[in-house]
């Protein structure tokens, strides 16, 4: 079987979950640290209304900046997120079938579910979870979402997060993300991952670790915090959640710069968690 390109992996997963019955959503247009932060997960996992969606989410983690020199760690990467609410009884079987669609033979390869309960302190979210390893390399995270914004999820949603770069490294049999086949084309049309993203990776790493203005980021954090509180009072939880995301990203940038002490870090986490909680609480009040 021909090895899938990076974009073919995405298209295959989209088609698989669309055939299952998921709505295929688009990435959220905000700086987020993971696909979980998309409001399609944070807000829609709350309440009783069924919700089945899948989407790609570009994600940013300033603390993982490596100037494009690390084989598989970047400050910008892609996740494929699936949310099934309520979680079906056969969710693990559905996941394994999706791997087969990507050309991974389950009879040959060692697929293991390694217990790893998931928690996001800034979102006030947690759930029973497993890392999914393929021949010793983590390729996905599997979680029963039990709490978001400090609110219990009833019913529990099933969350599957595919690490697209790691999955592609395994499928294509290469050692470095920059060498991944992005497009599946040959000749002049051939395109590698590094040609798409790695110039930006180097520049954003320099910004994240050397040039970001900490005083400006502190102001941005406080401004977003204040704006979030104001929007909640105006019964506008969705734009308020955008401000929560801005505060979260500013915190991540400050953390990457190394200007926040351990004590201060705990305080900032609690402040972002408070914003997430009031957004979730208000959204749930308005969508019962």
From Swiss-Prot:
One of its GO terms (cellular component) is cytosol. Transmembrane segments: none annotated. Its main location: cytoplasm. SUPFAM superfamilies: Class II aaRS and biotin synthetases. PROSITE patterns: AA_TRNA_LIGASE_II_GLYAB. Belongs to the class-II aminoacyl-tRNA synthetase family. This is Glycine--tRNA ligase alpha subunit. It comes from Rickettsia africae (strain ESF-5). The gene is glyQ.
